[in-house]
A protein has these predicted regions:
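Cys/His/Pro-rich metal-binding microdomains
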Residues: 20, 24, 283-286, 311-312
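Auxiliary Fe-S-binding modules of radical SAM enzymes
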Residues: 1-11, 35-38, 56, 61, ...
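Conserved AdoMet/S-adenosylmethionine-binding subsite of the radical SAM
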Residues: 82-245, 250-253
Length: 312
């Protein structure tokens, strides 16, 4: 569990890493190469992991505990960018006491065709157990959402957000009817103008995220100001929030940046354990207040009785 540098979430959680999409602009593939060690040697340590065949017949790796390097340090991506289920990471969610917006699978496509339903269901189970957080999922395979929904396996909780990543206006994305599932659209990197987008939909997505391609690729696409303006107009026409990533500052300027969130993602909740630690019922009025907003008055009816808590 890591604090995130991704502007639209608080933390990233990566119980699954690796992806088979093969996108040429993928930042995650480049990053894993720096923290994988010698993948060939890692695969020789067969006692440290297990494998299974994925739904698409690809080889998948499973780690029930971290694999260590020769120096005793955990290898974050011991199999490079090959799909890996880090089952030992499933309990890290419980270490967060305050409610957070958590991006699940920043270094993978959790809903790729190669990912077994069992892996996804295990992740959902953990998320459901810790409902003080908002969980944001992203995929380039939105059809998997539909398959899971039709099978009754896609949680409909209000704190689950299902996003689709697209880069061009002709790509498919998951569209859920209002009142069913929370969903959003991530247009990153934006590679073409979405200018006609607003004229072809009956309403905008509940949330739009947009960002430019980063890195030093000689073929990097630099979006035009009008491309971003058109998306903002679409969002504003339908009264929907839009979030611009910092990669757009050179394109639109800081004063034109929009960093809107859906209302729910701005609300923070806390775990039951932290609730009991920080809050207490006033002994006089019965209201539940933060302890640091209350004062203990030495008002005792007789010697030996505890002081009562009153609002400050």
């Amino acid at each position: 569990m890591n604090k995130s540098k991704i502007e639209w979430c608080d933390h990233t959680w990566n119980p699954i890493t690796g992806c088979n999409h093969g996108c040429h602009y993928c930042y995650a593939r480049t990053m894993t190469a720096r923290f994988s060690g010698d993948v060939r040697l890692n695969k020789m340590c067969k006692a440290d992991y297990s494998t299974q065949t994925g739904p698409d017949e690809s080889t998948l790796y499973i780690l029930d505990k971290p694999m260590l390097s020769e120096t005793g340090h955990p290898l974050v991506y011991p199999f490079g960018f090959e799909p890996t289920f880090h089952r030992y990471r499933m309990d890290t969610i419980g270490k967060l006491k305050m409610g957070n917006n958590i991006f699940v699978g920043a270094m993978a496509d959790v809903f790729g065709e190669w990912v077994p339903d069992q892996w996804i269901e295990e992740i959902f189970t953990v998320c459901l157990e810790h409902d003080e957080h908002n969980y944001l999922f992203l995929t380039k395979n939105p059809e998997r959402y539909m398959k899971l929904a039709n099978a009754g396996k896609l949680p409909q909780q209000n704190n689950f957000w299902y996003g689709t990543t697209v880069t061009r206006p002709d790509q498919e994305y998951a569209w859920f009817e209002s009142g069913t599932y929370n969903w959003f659209l991530s247009i990153e990197p934006i590679l073409e103008d979405f200018g006609k987008f607003g004229a072809t939909v009956k309403t905008a997505p509940p949330w739009i995220i947009v960002g430019a391609q980063t890195g030093r690729s000689k073929n990097k696409v630099i979006p035009e100001f009008e491309w971003i303006k058109n998306l903002v107009l679409t969002a504003d026409t339908f009264g929907k929030p839009i979030f611009m990533k910092d990669s757009l500052i050179p394109i639109v300027g800081e004063k034109n940046m929009r960093r809107d969130f859906p209302k729910q993602l701005l609300e923070k909740t806390i775990s039951e354990k932290m609730q009991n630690k920080l809050y207490e019922a006033c002994s006089e009025c019965g209201k539940v207040l933060r302890k640091n907003q209350m004062v203990a008055l030495m008002a005792r009816s007789k010697r030996g009785t505890p002081a009562k808590q009153y609002p400050s």
